[in-house]
Amino acid sequence: MPQTTMVSYLIMALLYIIPILIAVAFLTLVERKILSYMQSRKGPNIVGPFGLLQPIADGIKLFIKEPIRPSTSSPLLFIMMPMLALLLALTAWVPLPLPFSLVDLNLGVLFMVAMSS
């Protein structure tokens, strides 16, 4: 029984995280489009119709790039810190009062202020 609960929490967490990441990708696309119009350029319009597949192309490019690590850096810290930064950014979304919330915080607003600072 506890395994079923853990799987359901994992699924709920993924159902929270994936739309947030997709929204961030497309908001970045909108930002790039607006900045390109301000600079009298066309902006990202190569990949897909009107550049709608540009966030996917950016993600693929990010994953196939060769990781270059400074020789004096710690390998563990160099790999873990971007993951920790993403985790902290996504943690700010946890106490939002959605129909199936992940946690029930009495001080949800205080938690959101603390995580965003």
Swiss-Prot record:
Q: Name one GO biological process term.
A: aerobic respiration
Specify the protein's topology with respect to the membrane.
Multi-pass membrane protein
GO CC, sorted alphabetically, is: mitochondrial inner membrane
Say which enzyme class the record assigns: translocase
> InterPro entries from the entry?
NADH_UbQ_OxRdtase_su1/FPO (IPR001694), NADH_UbQ_OxRdtase_su1_CS (IPR018086)
What are the alphabetically sorted keywords of the record? Electron transport, Membrane, Mitochondrion, Mitochondrion inner membrane, NAD, Respiratory chain, Translocase, Transmembrane, Transmembrane helix, Transport, Ubiquinone
Q: What does this protein do?
A: Core subunit of the mitochondrial membrane respiratory chain NADH dehydrogenase (Complex I) that is believed to belong to the minimal assembly required for catalysis. Complex I functions in the transfer of electrons from NADH to the respiratory chain. The immediate electron acceptor for the enzyme is believed to be ubiquinone.
Per its record, how is this protein called by name? NADH-ubiquinone oxidoreductase chain 1
Q: Which organism is it from?
A: Anas platyrhynchos
